[in-house]
Amino acid sequence: MKRIIVMVLKNILFVPYYWIMLNWYAAHVDNYTEEQRYAMLKKIDHAANRGGNLCIQSYGVENIPSQNGFIFYPNHQGLYDVLAIMEVCPVPFSVVAKKEVGNVPFLKQVFACMKAFLIDRDDIKQ
């Protein structure tokens, strides 16, 4: 929690701009290409990581296919996995998340830009 506060405080001048831009892209998803939306999210992600004094190191990025799809299986229950993967992944991707986090401010807009799939974990027919 402290790290998130540090991230916001170090980017306090940019937070209103990023928030407005994120809301605009989320409201007009179909007006932007997947690459444009991903570039905007990467810009916000990079600023957040830099503000939190985080240095993300990656290995094997050259093995990520640029077409025909791929699946990442992060093994952490927190929400930081997506930020770390987004920092280093060269191609746009989406996420599958539980529907409960789909109404959390900020995550709601990020998921809209990513065209994330929200699932109900109680409904086994999904």
What are these regions (language model features)?
Residues C55-Q126:
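Soluble catalytic domains of membrane acyltransferases
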Residues M1-Q57, Q109-V110:
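A transmembrane-helix-recognition feature enriched in membrane-embedded lipid enzymes
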